[in-house]
Amino acid sequence: MIVQALTQYYQTMEQAGKIAAPGWGPVKVSFALYLGANGALERIVSVQTEQIRGKKTVLAPQVMNLPAPVKRTVGVAANFLCDNSGYLLGIDDKGKPKRTMECFSACKALHEKLLEGVDAPAAQAVLAFFRTWEPKKAREHPALAEHIDDILAGGNLVFRTEEGYVHENPAVRQAWETYYSSAGDGPRGICLITGEEGPVELSLIHI
């Protein structure tokens, strides 16, 4: 009974937007990549907010509700719609260009897998971006000029179009949730409360 009550409480909080839904979580984001309908990078805008720390006012990353990030160790593992410059742009200051290209390629493959059949301009813009973006020419791109040092420092980036943030698009959200609940590579199990199969993380949320 206690577990069932906790489950109902969780679902109520989720519906009210007070906690993240399964497959989603709070992520610190520093910049938004604005894409045109053809996938071209039009500009990069800081989404950092001013915060008071002690006697100083500093710029801090904005916390957004995004697809749950992967747990990285030493291998290459891309995140969906939000990552650092190595994965989304194919450039960083780590001095390992071959590995950085592997990161970009992995990120491109993930987005092609999840967005290929999504009938939404935002999804198609992201696909077009990955298919046309040239990491070797990235540092020369005018959109990066103003924030290049901060971007290479490792902050997270997200995609945005004229419609808004891509991760907030209903069709894109559905694509991610379908992938997360049925096509993840991690261990799976049956929830004792709902009887639904899903990633172990989903089942543990109910306990």
Predicted regions and their residues:
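Conserved phosphate-interacting/catalytic interface
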Residues: 1-189
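Short Cys/His-rich metal-coordination motifs, predominantly Zn2+-binding knuckles/fingers
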Residues: 194
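Short, non-ligating residues that shape and space the ligands of small metal-coordination modules
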Residues: 197-201
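Conserved small/polar residues in nucleotide/adenosyl-binding loops
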Residues: 205-207
